[in-house]
Amino acid sequence: MSIIDNRKAHFDYHIEERYEAGLVLEGWEVKALRAGRGQIKEGYVVVKNAEIFLIGTHISPLPEASTHIHPDPVRTRKLLLHREEIKKLIGKVEQRGYTLVPLNFHYKGGRVKCDIALAKGKKLHDKRETEKKRHWEREKARIMRAGT
């Protein structure tokens, strides 16, 4: 079951490969995610020093958060992957046009995981084509319903 989805990722990118990564989170962040207070639409993934980080995701702290902790909602969060997966991703990202995008946050065994995708950006005409296909599928379904 997904906690947060990045629906815009499928519109803006051609998804090549998907990976499931663990997240290094603080306690207040897990509580906030359980309450559904997160957003990954603006997020992106970068590689620094053979480590992978999630930048730009927003997790709003709950008002009941501890008074001695000053939460930063947009802090950089480390992603946990196997070394071989990281090496493979570094090789792919260094190729022209490839990037890493967060797709969703979900639970697995009580832990919060992040699906990331190796993706290639869509051009404007690709986005228009996707929109036309989606519109045609809706029209086709509407015509089929009207015919029966």
UniProtKB/Swiss-Prot annotation:
Family to which the UniProt record says this protein belongs: Belongs to the SmpB family.
Instruction: Tell me yes or no: is Transmembrane helix among this UniProt entry's keywords.
Output: no
**Which keywords does the record carry?**
Cytoplasm, RNA-binding
Q: Pfam families, per this entry?
A: SmpB (PF01668)
Please tell me whether the keyword Transcription is annotated for this protein: no
The listed locations are: Cytoplasm
Q: Which domain of life is it from?
A: Bacteria
- Xref: InterPro entries: SmpB (IPR023620), SsrA-bd_prot (IPR000037), SsrA-bd_prot_CS (IPR020081)
UniProt protein name: SsrA-binding protein
- Which HAMAP family is this protein grouped with? SmpB
- Species of origin: Burkholderia ambifaria (strain ATCC BAA-244 / DSM 16087 / CCUG 44356 / LMG 19182 / AMMD) (Burkholderia cepacia (strain AMMD))
Role description: Required for rescue of stalled ribosomes mediated by trans-translation. Binds to transfer-messenger RNA (tmRNA), required for stable association of tmRNA with ribosomes. tmRNA and SmpB together mimic tRNA shape, replacing the anticodon stem-loop with SmpB. tmRNA is encoded by the ssrA gene; the 2 termini fold to resemble tRNA(Ala) and it encodes a 'tag peptide', a short internal open reading frame. During trans-translation Ala-aminoacylated tmRNA acts like a tRNA, entering the A-site of stalled ribosomes, displacing the stalled mRNA.
Its main subcellular localisation, reduced to a broad class, is cytoplasm
Q: Name one GO cellular component term.
A: cytosol
